[in-house]
């Protein structure tokens, strides 16, 4: 009886263990250095005070799906969304975004950001700072929101 039970339970446990291992390995891990909420602190001649007053942010906390992260962006008026792909070697590609369509008094920051974000081709994460740049020397600098 005990031998028969072992013959039945051993393969059953092996299958369950294999399923557990395969399931755990398919979960994509987040990159804690990149996938966080970022506050915009330097961009296109806008003062840091303007950026802070607008609560300018880019949220990269969504899960990676096939290497891509859905970025949620706010620049003081509308909510925007872009698909971003951060690649090895400091390369990034950012899709044309979508946005809500509210009309606000001062949309200069939002309009400028929306035009420039798609042109960013490089990135670097140094400490608590994320910098995006294009091939013409334009940059966007962010600081991690959870950094004191």
Predicted regions and their residues:
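Lipid interaction determinants
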Residues: 2, 10, 22-148
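Sec-dependent N-terminal signal peptides
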Residues: 8-18
């Amino acid at each position: 009886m005990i031998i028969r039970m072992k013959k039945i339970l051993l393969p059953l446990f092996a299958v369950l263990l294999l399923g557990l291992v395969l399931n755990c390995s398919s979960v994509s891990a987040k990159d804690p250095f990149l996938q966080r909420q970022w506050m915009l602190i330097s961009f296109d001649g806008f003062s840091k005070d303007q950026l802070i007053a607008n609560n300018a942010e880019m949220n990269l906390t969504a899960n990676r799906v096939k290497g891509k992260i859905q970025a949620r962006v706010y620049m003081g008026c509308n909510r925007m969304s872009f698909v971003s792909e951060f690649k090895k070697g400091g390369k990034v590609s950012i899709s044309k975004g979508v946005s809500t369509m509210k009309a606000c008094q001062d949309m200069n920051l939002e309009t400028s950001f929306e035009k420039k974000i798609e042109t960013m081709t490089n990135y670097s994460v140094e400490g608590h700072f994320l910098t995006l740049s294009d091939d013409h020397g334009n940059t966007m600098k962010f600081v991690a929101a959870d950094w004191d």
